A protein has these predicted regions:
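Accessory RNA 3′-end/elbow-binding domains used by RNA modification enzymes
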Residues: 1-13, 19-36, 40, 44, ...
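Catalytic cores of RNA-modifying enzymes
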Residues: 1-173, 177-209
Length: 303
């Protein structure tokens, strides 16, 4: 059986690191060529996009996609990690907060904002992960970054000494929902942290198509659909969904196949999926200049 290749959408279980999921899928697929398009915290669940075989070449173009999350923010306590896994560093009664007050405090978080990432994060500071520095007792101060919160909806508010707020957000890549919880709590004067986080979307890939890991393991053992029992999106299917598309002529496809340049045509984007006349994903092109630049090639003879 040939090695599998394509894109797999997994529903990451709570308690698993993203690398744990990659390691499991490597065993199921029988290949080490497995990677993911964006880390999820161990506490979080939801969409994790994996590339297998040559599908790993597509991950570069998925990392920067917008993402959607469902989350629960707890107002009335702040933690060192900005989520429920960290030690509580302050607690203030939030019993006085009304839904109207919470909604008003949320308004400034919509749109383009400046956000300081959570200190306990995978961001590198002088070559070392921020979370490793925090765990070593260092005081880590990360620089603010520009992010966009294109949707911030409140679904439910559950009052008490602490107030739990169920939300749904759509955010740009690099946005920390934990930091949103922290900053909302600060804005309301009571502190806040995240107690639940579920990623519902990465770009065009949604939770409705995500596969349960245990079900994947059972399916793989039974030799179910897909290579090695894994229900993969083909390179062509993933490319058509995730990127702007250019349909090549036979002459253009032949030229690209021989490593020759072609003129840009169609979407003037940095990543355009270029397809042969018979529907094969041949390359990802940068078409921001008159002559298209090849970023990734998927030779037909290797299929």
């Amino acid at each position: 059986m040939s090695a599998p290749e394509g894109v797999l959408i997994v529903d990451k279980p709570t308690g698993w690191t993203s690398h744990d999921v990659v390691a499991r899928v490597r065993r199921l697929a029988g290949t080490r060529r497995v990677g993911h398009a964006g880390t999820l915290d161990p506490m979080a669940t939801g969409v994790l996009v994996l590339g297998i075989g040559r599908g790993t070449k597509l991950l570069t173009f998925l990392v920067g996609c917008d993402k959607g999350y469902a989350a629960t923010i707890r107002l009335g306590a702040a933690t060192v990690t900005d989520d429920a896994e960290g030690e509580v560093v302050s607690a203030t009664s939030a019993a006085h907060l009304t839904r109207e007050a919470i909604e008003a405090a949320i308004a400034p978080f919509r749109g383009a904002i400046s956000q300081v990432p959570s200190a306990v994060s995978a961001i590198k500071v002088d070559g070392r992960r921020a979370y490793a520095r925090v765990r070593a007792g260092e005081d880590v101060q990360l620089a603010a970054r520009a992010v966009t919160v294109s949707r911030f909806d409140v679904l439910d508010v559950r009052p008490g000494t602490t107030v739990d707020v169920d939300i749904e957000v759509d955010v740009s890549s690099g946005t920390f929902v934990r930091a949103v919880a922290r900053d909302l709590g600060t804005a309301l004067g009571v502190g806040g942290h995240l107690v639940a986080l579920r990623r519902t979307r990465v770009g065009c890939f949604t939770i409705g198509e995500a596969h349960d890991l245990e079900a994947l393991s059972a399916r793989s053992g039974e030799g179910g659909t897909g290579a090695h029992g894994i229900p993969l999106l083909s390179l062509a299917a993933a490319g058509r969904r995730a990127l702007p598309v250019r349909d090549l002529s036979e002459a253009e496809a032949r030229a690209l196949g021989f490593g020759q340049p072609v003129a840009s045509s169609g979407p003037a984007e940095e990543a355009v999926a270029a397809f042969t006349p018979d529907g094969h994903l041949l390359a990802v092109l940068d078409q921001t200049k008159p002559r298209a630049r090849t970023r990734v090639v998927f030779p037909i003879e290797d299929s």
